[in-house]
Curated annotation (Swiss-Prot):
ATP binds at residues 66-74. The gene is ZEU1. Catalyzes the conversion of dTMP to dTDP. Involved in the regulation of DNA replication. Is essential to promote the first division of the zygote. Pathway: Pyrimidine metabolism; dTTP biosynthesis. It comes from Arabidopsis thaliana (Mouse-ear cress). Disruption phenotype: Embryonic lethality when homozygous, due to arrest of the embryo sac development soon after fertilization. It is an enzyme of class 2 (transferase). This is Thymidylate kinase. The lineage of its organism: Eukaryota, Viridiplantae, Streptophyta, Embryophyta, Tracheophyta. It comes from the Eukaryota. One of its GO terms (cellular component) is nucleoplasm.
C-alpha cells in the first residue's frame, strides 16, 4: 500500500501553486472567463487537439455529476457494462483518483485524517484532474469512450459552497477537456441522506449539500442533461443510456474536442 504524503509535501505542493492562487496572477484570466462557456479550437494548441472537419472518429467524454449519494457510481458502472456490451470500447474513471500521490493526499483529507486550507485542497483536486489530462485525450482520440464519475464541476461547486470565489475556483480548470455531455443526477439533499453510507466522509452534511446544489445550478449549461435520480433505478438507467448513445454517435462521426471554460 502506498504511503500517504506528509503535510510538508502538501506545503511544498501548495507553494508551487502560489502564482496561480494569487489575485494578481488571476486578474487577466478571470477577465476572460465567461460563465459556462466552451471554446471550440480552430487550430493547434499546446496539447495537439484539433477541431477541423477532418477530425477522425473518437470516443465520447461522458461525465456524471450530482450530490453525494445521488447514485452516480452505480449508474456509471451500469453504463460501462451497457456500452461495452454494445461493442463500444469504454472505460470508467473517477475523480478524485485516489491512487496517485496527489489523490492520496485528497483521500486523507476527505476521510478526516488530515486538515488542509480550503484553497490548498481545491488546487489539489484540480491537480488530480490535470494528472490524467494527457491520458484522457489519448484515450478519446484513439476511440475509447470515457465515463467519468465527477469532474471539474464537482470541484468548483464544493469549493464555492465553502465560500471561495466561483471564478477563482474555475480558473485552474481552464484547459482541461470539456465533456461531450454532463448527466446531472438530481436529488434533494434530504433524500440523498436517507441512502446507505451517508455521512462517512467530510462533505456529507445536508446543509452543506444544499449549498453545493445551488452552485451546480449556476454551473449548468447546454451540455447538461438533468436526470431525476429519485426515479426507479431502471428508469434512471434507461434515460442515461438514451442520452449517451446520441453522444457516442456524434463522436464517432467526428465531433471535435473542445476545452472547458475557455473564451
Amino acid at each position: 500500500m502506498k504511503r500517504i504524503c506528509s503535510v510538508s509535501s502538501v506545503q511544498l505542493f501548495s507553494r508551487s501553486f502560489r502564482a496561480l492562487a494569487s489575485p494578481r496572477s488571476l486578474n487577466y484570466p478571470l477577465q476572460c472567463i465567461k460563465r459556462s462557456s466552451v471554446r471550440m479550437e480552430s487550430s493547434n494548441f499546446s496539447s495537439g487537439v484539433r477541431t477541423e472537419s477532418s477530425v477522425k472518429p473518437r470516443g465520447a467524454l461522458i461525465v456524471l455529476e450530482g450530490l453525494d449519494r445521488s447514485g452516480k457510481s452505480t449508474q456509471c458502472a451500469k453504463l460501462l457494462s451497457f456500452l461495452n456490451g454494445l461493442g463500444h470500447p469504454t472505460e470508467l474513471w473517477r475523480f478524485p483518483d485516489r491512487e496517485t500521490s496527489v489523490g492520496q493526499m485528497i483521500s486523507a483529507y476527505l476521510s478526516n485524517k488530515s486538515q488542509l486550507d480550503d484553497h490548498t485542497i481545491h488546487l489539489l483536486f484540480s491537480a488530480n484532474r490535470w494528472e490524467k489530462r494527457s491520458l484522457m485525450e489519448e484515450k478519446l482520440k484513439t476511440g475509447t469512450t470515457l465515463i467519468v464519475d465527477r469532474y471539474s464541476y464537482s470541484g468548483v461547486a464544493f469549493s464555492s459552497a465553502k465560500g471561495l470565489d466561483i471564478e477563482w475556483c474555475k480558473a485552474p480548470e481552464i484547459g482541461l477537456l470539456a465533456p461531450d455531455s454532463v448527466l446531472y443526477l438530481d436529488i434533494s439533499p434530504e433524500r440523498a441522506a436517507e441512502r446507505g453510507g451517508y455521512g462517512d466522509e467530510r462533505y456529507e452534511r445536508v446543509e452543506f449539500q444544499k449549498k453545493v446544489a445551488d452552485f451546480y445550478q449556476t454551473l449548468g449549461d447546454s451540455s447538461w442533461k438533468i436526470i431525476n435520480a429519485s426515479d426507479a433505478m431502471e428508469e434512471v438507467e434507461k434515460k442515461i443510456q438514451q442520452v449517451v448513445l446520441d453522444q457516442v454517435k456524434e463522436c464517432t462521426e467526428g465531433k471535435p474536442l473542445s476545452l472547458l471554460w475557455s473564451s
